[in-house]
Amino acid sequence: MSTFSLKIIRVGITVLVVVLAVIAIFNVWAFYTESPWTRDAKFTADVVAIAPDVSGLLTEVPVKDNQLVQKGQILFVIDQPRYQQALAEAEADVAYYQTLAAEKQREFSRRHLLGIQALSQEEIDQASNVLQTVQHQLAKTIAVRNLARLDLERTTIRAPAEGWVTNLNVHAGEFINRGATAVALVKKDTFYILAYLEETKLEGVKPGYRAEITPLGSNRILHGTVDSISAGVTNSSSSADSKGLATIDNNLEWVRLAQRVPVKIHLDSEDQQYLYPAGTTATVVITGPNDRDPHQASPMTKLMHRLREFG
């Protein structure tokens, strides 16, 4: 074979290798930048801020931080003797006005039966007015009694649902004000994912699509279903002036960063058992209408999914 032929073969091989490399790099880049995935995803759950409806000293806190509690379980108790005394006083007032109202009712009935032949109309009207006044006062004391009873019931704060007590920052002996958050309750079986996907990747995301979730630092792959896509995000380029007119930012960057849009993903029920704290990070890949068969993925695809963990 001549030297010229060898040169042609070498050049051809080199060109072929370069072309294949360019194609591979292009495919990798397109796969990496256009496929619907993100490393910016967070585990989230329904969280209830537990705050008392009454004020007073904490007498009991029978739970511990990060404890799993059942629905209706006592979380803490507030100064019941004070509210028991208030209820007893209110019940005494109700009993007094019930007796007084019965007495005034008998007096009015007696005067009404006697009629204007024995009494003046003014005396009959006066008895009626006194009866109405006492009845109104009785209704008021009953309302106060019912409120005192409700306050006493609410001195015992119970878990509204099954979940984990977290950030418990109160202890027995402390004074707590009405409406002051004492603890957070993370509801069990309510965990979901908020994946912040770039707007350029939303074309491949639809409600009902399946998703793979890989917690940061874990090899376990969880599965879920896209529930919804956020209907809007903050417009940082525009604001309203005092007249209500839009104020537009005059600066337009040469490099425009894609806006991130929250996508809510519900975890499958079998994956709810793996407890990853709300707020921790995960990588999310939207696989389309169906789950991806891990055995059919090419080595390059597997490599790309692994590289996503590193950015």
Swiss-Prot record:
Recorded family membership: Belongs to the membrane fusion protein (MFP) (TC 8.A.1) family.
Organism: Yersinia pseudotuberculosis serotype O:1b (strain IP 31758)
Encoding gene per record: aaeA
Gene Ontology molecular function: transmembrane transporter activity
GO cellular component, one term: plasma membrane
PANTHER family named among the record's database cross-references: P-HYDROXYBENZOIC ACID EFFLUX PUMP SUBUNIT AAEA, P-HYDROXYBENZOIC ACID EFFLUX PUMP SUBUNIT AAEA-RELATED
Localization in the cell: Cell inner membrane
Lipid bilayer topology: Single-pass membrane protein
Function: Forms an efflux pump with AaeB.
Membrane-spanning ranges: 11-31
Protein name: p-hydroxybenzoic acid efflux pump subunit AaeA
Recorded superkingdom: Bacteria
Keywords: Cell inner membrane, Cell membrane, Membrane, Transmembrane, Transmembrane helix, Transport
